[in-house]
């Protein structure tokens, strides 16, 4: 593939790591963010110390605080902004974009209020004549590992397989490998909903529970994710792949995961407001829990773990009490997880 001009919208940890991958592959990378000081740091010092203290970026990676300049003559746009601002940024893109491009996103969440997936938001806000089918880039990936070029395998999903193959081509190299998929709903919901389970897994650790309990929440959490995803139109098999169980394992077991760390702090008795302030980064699992709980209620899907985490986050339920409530639920067969509502 010829070198591409790619705008990466969002200078957070994952946006920065993906920018480096694309730069390593010979593409012209333009990072866009709305903090002029952060953009100046990337351009002048080739660092992004808010997220990576000891990483020096290639000087060819350029940063912009003007969206119109970042998008000038680009071949592709990669959204890596928090879910809560995706619609706003997409509207801004639609206002200044002058030509058709590939649209990809690597964000994980559901929009509060509408409960919509990221790709749906992008489809609604960016006119069809300016884009192809949206590509979702998602899977088991810690930015802290990708930025040091540790081996990472994830999925690229689009309703148009050629668009997924485009993402595969621009990203894949010796340490970063993409597999294509056409189940956009499955890949997106898996990436969003696993953050909820990661909060729960962290809470178990903070409460002092052992590996048995952590394995249980991951596997039963996967059952919940699959139930809701299938009700939304996803393929069940997707949840056994990289974007499903793979992402759930890496997010639900690692201190690199901000969602896991948030849950751990909750389990140790810290208040959510203090946790969010101390972390200084978006904890997608918190807002996604609310959206998923409301969506499950709307669709009539049984999600006891999600419901419990919702009550801990939004109704001040004691975390240990919530766990005991789950353990006291009526017993049932394990494999009722897809069709049982």
From Swiss-Prot:
Protein residues bound to NADPH: 13-14, 108, 143, 258, 282, 284
Catalytic residues of the enzyme: 194
Compartmental location: Cytoplasm
Top-rank taxon: Bacteria
NADP in keyword set: yes
Catalytic activity, as annotated: sn-glycerol 3-phosphate + NAD(+) = dihydroxyacetone phosphate + NADH + H(+); sn-glycerol 3-phosphate + NADP(+) = dihydroxyacetone phosphate + NADPH + H(+)
Family: Belongs to the NAD-dependent glycerol-3-phosphate dehydrogenase family.
Protein name per UniProt: Glycerol-3-phosphate dehydrogenase [NAD(P)+]
């Amino acid at each position: 593939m010829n070198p591409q001009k790619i705008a990466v919208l969002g200078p957070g940890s994952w946006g920065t790591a993906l920018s480096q991958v694309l730069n390593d592959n010979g593409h012209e990378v333009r990072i866009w963010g709305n903090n002029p000081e952060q953009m100046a740091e990337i351009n002048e010092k080739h660092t992004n110390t808010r997220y990576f203290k000891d990483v020096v970026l290639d000087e060819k990676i350029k940063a912009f605080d003007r969206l119109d300049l970042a998008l000038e003559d680009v071949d592709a746009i990669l959204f890596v902004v928090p879910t809560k601002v995706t619609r706003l940024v997409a509207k801004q893109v639609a206002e200044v974009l002058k030509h058709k491009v590939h649209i990809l996103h690597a964000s994980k969440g559901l929009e509060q209020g509408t409960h919509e997936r990221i790709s749906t938001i992008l489809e609604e806000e960016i006119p069809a004549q300016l884009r192809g089918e949206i590509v979702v880039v998602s899977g088991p990936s810690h930015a802290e590992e990708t930025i040091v070029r540790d081996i990472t395998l994830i999925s690229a999903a689009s309703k148009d397989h050629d668009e997924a193959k485009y993402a595969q081509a621009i990203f894949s190299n010796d340490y970063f490998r993409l597999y294509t998929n056409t189940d956009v709903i499955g890949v997106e919901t898996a990436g969003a909903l696993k953050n909820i389970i990661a909060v729960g897994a962290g809470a178990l650790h903070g409460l002092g529970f052992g590996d048995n309990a952590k394995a249980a929440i991951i596997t039963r959490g996967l059952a919940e994710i699959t139930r809701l995803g299938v009700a939304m139109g996803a393929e069940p098999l997707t949840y056994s792949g990289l974007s499903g169980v793979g992402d759930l394992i890496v997010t639900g077991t690692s201190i690199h995961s901000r969602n896991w760390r948030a849950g751990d702090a909750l389990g140790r008795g810290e208040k959510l407001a203090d946790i969010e302030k101390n972390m200084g980064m978006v904890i997608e699992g918190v807002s996604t829990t609310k959206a998923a709980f409301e969506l499950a209620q709307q669709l009539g899907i049984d999600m006891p773990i999600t419901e419990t985490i919702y009550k801990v986050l939004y109704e001040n339920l004691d975390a240990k009490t919530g766990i005991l409530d789950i353990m006291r639920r009526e017993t049932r067969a394990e494999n009722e997880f897809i069709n049982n509502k």
